[in-house]
Amino acid sequence: MASDSSLGNTNDGPPSPGENVSSPIENTYSSPAALHRRRRGRSSTPTQFATPPPPPSRLASSNSTPPTSRPSAARSKGRNGHGGGGGGGGGGDPGTPMSTDEPLPSSDDGEEDGGDDTTPTFVWGTNISVQDVKSAIEMFVKHFREARENSDDLFREGKYMVSIRKVIEIEGEWIDVDAFDVFDYDPDLYNKMVRYPLEVLAIFDIVLMDIVSTINRLFEKHVQVRIFNLRTSTSMRNLNPSDIEKMISLKGMIIRSSSIIPEIREAVFRCLVCGYFSDPIIVDRGKISEPPTCLKQECMTKNSMTLVHNRCRFADKQIVRLQETPDEIPEGGTPHTVSLLLHDKLVDNGKPGDRIEVTGIYRAMTVRVGPAHRTVKSVFKTYIDCLHIKKASKLRMSAEDPMDVDNSLRRVDEDVELDEEKLRKFQELSKQPDIYERLSRSLAPNIWELDDVKKGLLCQLFGGNALNLASGANFRGDINILLVGDPGTSKSQLLQYIHKLSPRGIYTSGRGSSAVGLTAYVAKDPETGETVLESGALVLSDRGICCIDEFDKMSDSARSMLHEVMEQQTVSIAKAGIIASLNARTSVLACANPSGSRYNPRLSVIENIHLPPTLLSRFDLIYLILDKPDEQTDRRLAKHIVALHFENAESAQEEAIDITTLTTYVSYARKNIHPKLSDEAAEELTRGYVELRKAGKFAGSSKKVITATPRQIESLIRLSEALARMRFSEWVEKHDVDEAFRLLRVAMQQSATDHATGTIDMDLINTGVSASERMRRDTFASSIRDIALEKMQIGGSSMRLSELLEELKKHGGNINTEIHLHDVRKAVATLASEGFLVAEGDRIKRV
């Protein structure tokens, strides 16, 4: 333990508690964003009470006289907390202590910044010249041109000069600068920017404002730079104290984000005696300096000032928790997490489940022993002050509200916005007559055959339109698929491939998933101590695809949570005083192995994998992938697997579309193409559904088998819309409906075929018992009833089941199939539930 005073003069280690007395996570007023941002050329109104002396400046001149530290102050006060001040209210690398009490630099104060002084100004503790850095930045901004520009473009304005003019035109506040461009133009400037981001970015802002004022002196907004795309991306588990106060870039997945926290920037006080309002007081390092007396000369009452909230100026702040992505976790390791601080425009740029790449400044902050104690712990907390956020992987699809047909407030996703050349290429690709086949061949090309399964998965990627009616009824547009089959039939490989493509995709295993792990659970926030709701796999997969392996090994409590998710697409929570309904608009892709590790074709799907019928009926497509021995098929499969190990294995897929093009194609279609049913397609859907229902009628019999349910026609609509999306068509046509019926029949013939009759029977999916099996059981029960009425008296002697079986064989005129003892037991159980018989062990008695 150490007190604030004992650590205040240290020259090594993390920032001193004098500059950082509380966590920005625990105290909303202690963020670097709390430092004041002034408009260019204006000065704040001075207060009339004493302020504490500023800490040492970041900049020191060569003659050891304390020079101005305007660039550092500008960065900390002028960036709204995005890259400037550092968490916990200032502080930072002890080699570069900073001052935030000095006025913000104005681009008009060139001489004070050292621009015209003969004595160079250096960053304190380094040999970095402020004048040299400013000159290098100015040269880069004015003269940088991309390498692909030809000689005719050499006389045009540079890349970032064009960006500045666009920002002025749209009255923006940010200019994104690619760090690779800085390195290509001036590697030394890049190294200084990464090592001393606070100082260099502050000078960057000054240069930008100088250029902006040269172009348009009436422009009042403070334009700032946002750096992204560093040359090296740091792993979360490799962060160490040497990275503190340096610019870093790392990738991860958002697992929790706080609500928007209002952070005060300027405070206004009012005297309770005379009603006098003070001038705005700048919040310094998260502290509000309350006037000890009324500032009005006629009043001067002590301790009479109170904060007036509606006259204060606030800014947005958000705390985000970032977790390592699964591909970065080493063998046997657990994922690491780090806290992010987002301010102003970066707030709500990411949602839980998003995979992002963050560029920011790694900061350290002290932790007090208690809220009322100035003593601090010797262990510091770390976090990242964010400068820039972008989507991490271009190989994943976008997840920006792709299926809501009535969502007019859709956000712009930069990753799906295409240039004219790529859009023209996609338009040409969509008009090819074999685009459907090419897309299916491009999906998991290393997996041999399974063409119909791949086409079903392709429809799941494109998805249908979610329909929200004015009456409040909602119809989902997500397609759910279940893969059932023998081990070694590429089920898990297909899941892994779809997981890599899907937006916000979560991959989980049924054996390792609990009910709360899939939906949501209540936990205690380690930073604030509050009870918060943590999102589970299905909620994190909102607008994406949740892949569940080993679906048959999931616990009953976990499976029961899927009923609401797969149809209503919400998760209802009522725990620990938290009552909420969370969105889980996700497609579910699950795979299951049959019990006994081998599929028994004589049993139904439900009997093979022991899943409840109510859950199984919510899947749009159920595919059986069986391992049937066949010499010709086995030879072709072996050749395909062996060919994958050759160097030129990819050359065999000449017509396949590469994964980057495929994901961008699917993302664009999901976001921009919303097909509607044409009259011809609607008539075909109606006619086809009626034909499916007619298939359950048998000539000469009054019994009918259910071969389709209303859920099937909803599945057909979703499949038809997905097929139209593949062609970039605004209308669903008849051939889309025909292909949707074919895909549904293929899946139903595999999973819903009654092997006793050879016909499709949806009762196998909905109830687990086919209509023919139910009729057979009814016949058994009727025969046993007749025998009991003939041979047994009410309350009389009992009969053994073996005797009953012999009687059935003698009097079984209506029974055309072989009779087994387990069939007799099922029929007796049916009669016992009706109260006609009582079963006592191996005997039955009439009651």
UniProtKB/Swiss-Prot annotation:
Protein name per UniProt: DNA replication licensing factor MCM4
Subcellular location: Nucleus
Annotated ATP binding sites: 485-492
Signal sequence, start to end: none
Zinc finger (C4-type): 271-299
Region: Disordered, residue numbers: 1-123
Top EC class of this enzyme: hydrolase
EC id: 3.6.4.12
Major localisation: nucleus
Organism: Arabidopsis thaliana
Segments of skewed composition (Gly residues): 81-94
Self-association and partners: Component of the minichromosome maintenance (MCM) complex, a heterotetramer composed of MCM2, MCM3, MCM4, MCM5, MCM6 and MCM7. Interacts with ETG1.
GO cellular component: chloroplast; MCM complex; THO complex
Keyword DNA-binding attributed: yes
Short name of any one Pfam family annotated for the protein: MCM_N
Alphabetical list of CDD domains matching this protein: MCM4 (cd17755)
Expression across tissues: Expressed in shoot apex and flower buds.
One annotated GO molecular function: DNA binding
Biased composition (Low complexity): 60-75
Function: Probable component of the MCM2-7 complex (MCM complex) that may function as a DNA helicase and which is essential to undergo a single round of replication initiation and elongation per cell cycle in eukaryotic cells.
Keyword Lipid metabolism attached: no
Domain MCM: 435-641
Reactions performed catalytically: ATP + H2O = ADP + phosphate + H(+)
Similarity comment text for this entry: Belongs to the MCM family.
Superkingdom in the source lineage: Eukaryota
One GO term (biological process): DNA replication
Polar residues bias locations: 1-31
